[in-house]
Amino acid sequence: MPVILPYIDEKKIDEVVANLDDNIYLVANNIYGLNYISTHSLIAGLGLNINNDFAIKLLSDLGIQSIILSLETNINFAKLHEDAFIYDIGYNVMMNFTHCPFIHLTGKSCESCQYSSSLEYKDEFNKCFAVRRIKINSCHFELINYRPINVYKKNNNQVLIDLRNFKNIDFINQIITSEEAIKLDNEYSGLLFKSID
């Protein structure tokens, strides 16, 4: 479920959720997602930024089936919660925003949308961050990390592998099947387990 859900999009999400099979889990990435706890199995997602025992207990008491730990979680905390998911491999979302970069760049309105999936933001180090649009009725955007996180085989948690933005599936197969997964981490490291604790 999207991190940002304007009122105009709630009805559409409600319709989609109402038609899902009972065996489908929903990932609640924001507080509004908890509204479905009485009707569906929920996983607390990255958007809830779960990184302490208080949040885990609160969500568990509410009836959440499982959680995905925050990207800022350190390895020691993750090891204490091996039943939780970690974002293991993928290009993580670094920012969500509702301001439309295409309106700014083109001067066009939503009615004459100039969306292109090739938009990237380039930082001062010449690193390119993809911009992904999420559209229901309205749009919001995600700024995607320029390099994938890879913490594969660093702990015993359940894993979340995000294949969005991978252009070459052979790369992901190499990470998962290679005995050198830890060596690959030097090149494809991310935020997880590099916390500020």
Residue ranges and their predicted role:
Residues M1-L58, L62-D197:
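Active-site pocket-lining/capping segments in soluble small-molecule metabolic enzymes
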